[in-house]
Amino acid sequence: MPENPSSSPTEPPEQSAAFEKWRSGLAQFTGLGLSESEKAERERLKAQGKLAKDWDKCEGWKRDLMNYSPMITFLLNHLKLAGCPFPSSAMQCHPCPENRAGGFSPDHGILLCQDRFFNKKHMEDTLAHELVHAFDHCRFKVDWGNLRHHACSEIRAANLSGDCRFTREVKRGFYAFNKQHQACVKRRAILSVLANPACTSPEMAEKAVNEVWESCFTDTRPFDEIY
């Protein structure tokens, strides 16, 4: 009996399974041809994979900086000398909102925003900034609810960490050459103090920064001068 030309030959089960695996893999790669539940699962897995990738990169950079960065090793050594050794476990990598790169908490240590760093240098500046806060908390017993105390540490951290170097300011859109460093330190200190729950207005933040500016801007401890 002649074969019906309109009928397709049936594939062996192993070939059919191989094709389905290929089709499913391609769909997951492109996002095309997926059901809504499959799309949601694909996005969940992508986000999960990105979190793991970001965390691995952040932890790797942290190890490198703790071992090889002159700035970071200097600050860690002086924290140890001050009686407050700062282990790797006190510097945690986590995802963060868009408007921050790190943070310091007396109770929890340093937050490194694993998904917000442009490069390792950005992370180095951020870690140095937070380690200055840690040093101040250890050495000077900062009362973080006191706006003048907070303002002083923010001035020192912005001044000493590299956070206000010219190239960073250019990326932020600030191009002035005359006293650019001082302007950056003051601007960023005011913004940080403004986020303090005890601060109720921009004017209050600016007043706190101005009141301690002279003594805190010139205080470069534990450095001999601005790095």
Curated annotation (Swiss-Prot):
Subcellular location: Mitochondrion inner membrane
Entry's EC annotation: 3.4.24.-
Sequence positions that bind a divalent metal cation: 129, 133
GO molecular function, a single term: metalloendopeptidase activity
Protein name per UniProt: Mitochondrial inner membrane protease ATP23
Listed Pfam families: Peptidase_M76
Source species, domain of life: Eukaryota
Described purpose of this protein according to its UniProt entry: Has a dual role in the assembly of mitochondrial ATPase. Acts as a protease that removes N-terminal residues of mitochondrial ATPase CF(0) subunit 6 at the intermembrane space side. Also involved in the correct assembly of the membrane-embedded ATPase CF(0) particle, probably mediating association of subunit 6 with the subunit 9 ring.
Keywords tagged on the record: Hydrolase, Membrane, Metal-binding, Metalloprotease, Mitochondrion, Mitochondrion inner membrane, Protease
GO biological process: mitochondrial protein processing; mitochondrial proton-transporting ATP synthase complex assembly
Principal EC category: hydrolase
Family: Belongs to the peptidase M76 family.
Species whose genome carries this gene: Cryptococcus neoformans var. neoformans serotype D (strain JEC21 / ATCC MYA-565) (Filobasidiella neoformans)
Membrane topology, as annotated: Peripheral membrane protein
Active site: 130
InterPro entries: Peptidase_M76_ATP23
Any one cellular-component term (Gene Ontology): mitochondrial inner membrane
Disulfide links within the chain: none
